[in-house]
Amino acid sequence: MQVGVFIPIGNNGWLISETSPQYMPSFELNKEITQKAEKYGFDFALSMIKLRGFGGKTEFWEHNLESFTLMAGLAAVTSKIKIFATVATLTIPPAIVARMASTIDSIAPGRFGVNLVTGWQKAEYSQMGLWPGEAHYTDRYNYLAEYTTVLKDLLETGVSDFKGKYFTMDDCRVSPHPKETKLICAGSSDEGLAFTAQYADYSFALGKGTNTPTAFASVNRRLEAAAAKTGRDVQSFILFMVIADETDEKAMAKWQKYRDGADQEALAWLTQQAAPNAKAGATTNTQQLAAPESAVNLNMGTLVGSYESIARMMDEIAQVPGTAGVLLTFDDFVQGVEDFGTKIQPLMKSRKGG
């Protein structure tokens, strides 16, 4: 099973809490995390893009780096680990993304890929006059299909003459173009999975619940059904947060502390912003992100326990049919990657060290 790290491009990582580690994003922090991940054999590092935060007492995600420029820097200071940047497709034309991808591939040949997001938080785009209107919630995958068609044309052949509703190319050219650039999509609605099965190489989905490592299995089954219609091989990666310590009790105490300190103002903003997109269907990511059960870490699957318990749950994840790997966040990234590499991974049967 492959393992990746979802690096903290925004302040405080993925914990919307006053009692979790508080920190600002920086290149040095993410370099330390990514180089440490590479040292311990992690397969890839991915950064998100976030253009407006949730506010609150912790100013959650009000402070963010930019994904492509950060990953270009990390590409230059690593040698093996794969590097994925995220593009908010409403903000950068596909021809420019293709040229940026070509440039980063020149820095790290064969190691770079792109994560495509349609955009669901209206405030991110309306603040700069780029929000296309409420129809985007229902038409976004049509937009993304055109966007990706142009991007793939340019990445694979260096030329695009695509003519569509949203994009019109006129002998558009990008050279040099990389030999291979993997594409990721994180949509989990039926429409999102259908898009992924048609255009992407990897699907990223949220794990579910606390210490319920296989609860996401239905997403894999839905992706498999979608891929069967397109005849393409699309690999599934699942997002989890790891909160580990020497004992189950110590780890659970940390988790409870973070939950007790939840930043309610920021969580209220998240709920407000997610509501319009959630109307698109109960299987959308935003419906899960804002659910009250564990909004303190955006309701991603959470693994809490001793190093032995985490290793056991990781192996359970690996047994779910269709799972190619996991994408991990940590409450404390520097210590978390260190502990994973030295204390968890060696115990895993699903990794080379196990």
Swiss-Prot record:
One of its GO terms (molecular function) is alkanesulfonate monooxygenase activity. Disulfide bonds: none annotated. Pfam families: Bac_luciferase (PF00296). The keyword Cytoplasm does not apply. FMN binds at residues 49-50, 115, 124, 140-141, 189. The keyword Flavoprotein applies. It catalyses: uracil + FMNH2 + NADH + O2 = (Z)-3-ureidoacrylate + FMN + NAD(+) + H2O + H(+); thymine + FMNH2 + NADH + O2 = (Z)-2-methylureidoacrylate + FMN + NAD(+) + H2O + H(+). InterPro entries: Luciferase-like_dom (IPR011251), Luciferase-like_sf (IPR036661), Pyrimidine_monooxygenase_RutA (IPR019914), SsuD_RutA_monooxygenase (IPR050172). Keywords: Flavoprotein, FMN, Monooxygenase, NADP, Oxidoreductase. It is an enzyme of class 1 (oxidoreductase). GO terms for biological process: alkanesulfonate catabolic process; nitrogen utilization; uracil catabolic process. Its EC number is 1.14.99.46. Belongs to the NtaA/SnaA/DszA monooxygenase family. RutA subfamily. HAMAP family: RutA. The FMN-N(5)-oxide reacts spontaneously with NADH to produce FMN. Requires the flavin reductase RutF to regenerate FMN in vivo. This is Pyrimidine monooxygenase RutA.
